[in-house]
Amino acid sequence: MRKRARKRAGEILVSRYLPRATLAAVREALVAKRKPEIRGMFGRIAHRYDLLNRMLSLGCDRGWRRAVAARVAAAGPGRLLDACTGTGDLALGQDAGAAIYGCDFSLPMLALARAKAAASATRPGWFAADVLRLPVADGALDAVTVGFGIRNFEDLEAGLAELARVLRPRGLLVILEFSTPRGRLAPALRWWVRRVPPLVGRLLSGDDEAYRYLAASVATFPDGGELCSRLAAAGFTGVRATTLTGGVATLYEGTRADDGEER
């Protein structure tokens, strides 16, 4: 079974040579087909998830999260949701004066987030939820953040629409996500993202499937201008993307359009 799993992941990695439209279809098919497996996978690697982010980000993810917190603080939100919160780092890095919530579909991830919060000045409210069906009223939130989770949405368009639904008009959305590096260092950076996490995963746990999946999900995710277009189509205005660390990650920002506002 492990050999078959590795073969599937390898096929997805090779798909980086396909046209972007095909890449998007491959990614969506992979996530939809394996959603229960993906939830279980995140549960299995929860105790190593922070280390994985250190590796994928070349150690830069803490600084990236501070950039997200600065964007959110500038907007001065009263009610903030960190969707796909994982082990809670992004939620815990927000201004303690706001009403902060963090949700994730992985219970082991949330357990680690709660444990971290015990030693933090920020005390978010945690709850388990699928980001496609958030138990939140329409327009209830001033801001939503998503860190390293949007590429795992089962249905990207439906997920973005759900984030727009729970935001008030002119509410802020900030997304931090890995992206495809470009420029002179791009080949070396892509090699790192594809090869190093699976290798370390194998050495640490003997199970590299999850790490291969996460590397593949970065390679097939519609980043940059394409994701900005999808955000605009979902009802966000003023959408912009800022690349970080040579394009290893990208910070996306947008506000939910007022009713009747032209997008």
Segments and roles (model prediction):
Residues T237, T243-R263:
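Core SAM-dependent methyltransferase catalytic element
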Residues E157-L172:
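A short glycine-rich, Lys/Arg-flanked "PGG" loop and its adjoining helix->strand segment in the class I
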Residues Y17-R48, V193, L204:
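N-terminal, positively charged/glycine-rich alpha-helical extensions of SAM-dependent methyltransferases
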